[in-house]
Amino acid sequence: DYIIVQDSTLIKDVNVFFGMKEGGIAIVNTEKAIDSPVPKGVKVITIDATSIALQKIGLPITNTALMGAFAAASGEIAFTALEDAVKRRFRGDLATKNIAAAKAAFDAVKGAA
């Protein structure tokens, strides 16, 4: 099981971890530690994807940063596959910036492992 939480304020109002099984991974866009109960055996990875997006893209659009974090945490997607997908979706400078955001998040998660 995997979940990606783009807005960490949801955790206060919604049990985003409901139904997650042991061995699951939750990636949460936040600069803070999670203080909500987490099911046994679920690994929570926090990453400040908003700051990464602002720094690399210039906008608080977190999608590619969170996908980079997901690729690193899960191993389900090779970074090269993510990079290729970004290049198919975006062109020029926008592709370069989104790849940089994904790579920064990927490296941050790999470095924390």
Go through the PLM ranges and name each one:
Residues D1-A113:
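Active-site cofactor/cluster-binding pocket
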